[in-house]
Amino acid sequence: MNKILETLLEEKKIKLKGSLYHLTQINFSYNSNHIEGSRLTEEQTQYIYETNSFIGDKEKVISIDDINETINHFKCFDYILENIYILDENLIKTLHKILKNNTSDSQQEWFKVGDYKLKANFIGNSKTISPSNVSKEMKKLLDEYNSKAKITFDDIVDFYYRFEAIHPFQDGNGRVGRLIMFKECLRNDVVPFIIDEEHKLFYYRGLKNYKEDKAYLIETCLSAQDKYIKLLNDLEIFK
């Protein structure tokens, strides 16, 4: 077990405030949901995490889904820490099920919580893999990825891009994919990273232009990794 995973699991167990686990939970949930349009602030996310309650802003309406998906993301993060084994469809679908539990999406008959999409969808103006082909394409992606003798940082980012291109779920693909990247970094002894507000536009551009220039998305993720390394150093994780 690598030092980062060991630290996260230990701090989770003892519920240590101000720790790597504590800060990662808040930072990861806030940023990953914010990218997808959540209106919660980082301070509100922290308050929800620390108190399991919510204080709203009179000037801004907050969706119940934003609150539930924030809480669900905390649970998703715990799930990946407790399931650092080879990546498979069951784990990916379970992350989606946890993330979308008790949301308005989960009340829709056509929205498959914890299963692949039934309706075609787009990323921007680009059509994704059709629902009838998702299962086949996901199996192919996982088989190719898991067959690698050694999985590198670049392999993890490449998997994420291909996962996003398939867009297997009706919604929640970005958050599930970023959770997968964090998990796979831990599993393969790579320092993980969180895509935050500072990196968001570069991240979008990297995804859009990945086929022509893989380096842009990889460099963006490496920059995000540098921020997590700084946090590790500030907390003296490797001392």
Model segments located where?
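FIC/Doc superfamily catalytic core
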Residues: 1-171, 175-239
